[in-house]
Regions:
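Catalytic P-loop NTPase motifs of RecA-like helicase/translocase cores
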Residues: 5, 31-32
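Active-site mouth loops of central-metabolism enzymes
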Residues: 1-7, 49
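Extended hydrophobic packing segments that form well-structured cores
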Residues: 155-166
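Shared catalytic-loop signature of beta/alpha-barrel
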Residues: 15, 21, 32-146, 150-153
Length: 166
């Protein structure tokens, strides 16, 4: 929901979509308000996820301490790179919480999820993938819904300098 709802409307929408048995309801409350998310989480039959739009470790800590989400969503392109995302994954692990990628950039984030014990789903967000396809060579393509980590050095893809020059 991209942090777009107040608590009342988030609850109403969650109740309406619960029969669809979705995996989780992503960032329903404005500004990822940990207190309001925790209250919402206690009242819902579906899991909540959050953090894809967060960039600071203490914001993830607050989501965990308040038990505001079931699934934490660090993103290496938004939240301070791989070092910060690994720290957040470690915090989540200490709270027995899985992580999932939200906010796209799967070719970057799949490496985080493949490298931590609580890594999980990686969102194949089409607009972000299209941007990556225009800027990089050697990107991994999904096969039957799965991305395979490359065995080449680094992230497994290279910057297309000609595309950047254009």
């Amino acid at each position: 929901a991209n942090c777009s709802l107040d608590a009342y409307h988030a609850f109403q929408l969650a109740q309406a979509i619960a029969p669809a048995r979705i995996g989780f309801f992503e960032e329903p409350i404005a500004e990822n308000d940990a207190r309001l998310l925790a209250d919402l989480r206690r009242r819902l039959p579906i899991q909540l996820a959050g953090g894809q739009n967060e960039g600071l470790a203490h914001r993830f800590r607050d989501l965990l301490v308040h038990q505001a989400v079931d699934v934490l969503q660090p993103n290496v392109t938004i939240g301070g790179g791989f070092t910060q995302a690994v720290r957040v994954a470690g915090m989540a692990s200490a709270f027995n919480s899985p992580i999932a990628n939200g906010g796209g950039w799967p070719c970057h984030n799949m490496h985080l999820h493949g490298g931590v014990e609580n890594g999980g789903l990686v969102e194949y967000h089409h607009p972000a993938v299209v941007v990556c396809q225009q800027l990089f060579n050697g990107l991994t393509e999904p096969v039957d819904g799965w991305l395979t980590l490359p065995e080449t050095p680094g992230l497994g893809f290279d910057l297309d300098r000609d595309a950047v020059a254009e």
